[in-house]
UniProtKB/Swiss-Prot annotation:
Tree of life domain: Viruses
Pfam families: Corona_NS4
Entry similarity comment: Belongs to the coronaviruses ns4/ns4.8 protein family.
Protein name per the record: Non-structural protein of 4.8 kDa
The species this protein was found in: Bovine coronavirus (strain Quebec)
Phenotype upon changing S18I: In strain: Isolate BCQ.571, Isolate BCQ.1523, Isolate BCQ.2590, Isolate BCQ.3994 and Isolate BCQ.7373
InterPro entries: Corona_NS4
Organism lineage: Viruses, Riboviria, Orthornavirae, Pisuviricota, Pisoniviricetes
Length: 45
């Protein structure tokens, strides 16, 4: 079952259907706050 990630009202379900970690990484790289996912962007840098 695909996990729908909604950020700022945008559905990212079909953009990156791989892993949550990858979604968080991509989200941080474009400046999206991923604090709601339980991950922190600072851990990637």
């Amino acid at each position: 079952m695909p996990m729908a990630t909604t950020i700022d009202g945008t559905d990212y379900t079909n953009i990156m259907p791989s892993t949550v970690s990858t979604r968080v990484y991509l989200g941080c790289s474009i400046g999206i706050d991923t604090s709601t996912t339980g991950f922190t962007c600072f851990s990637w840098y």
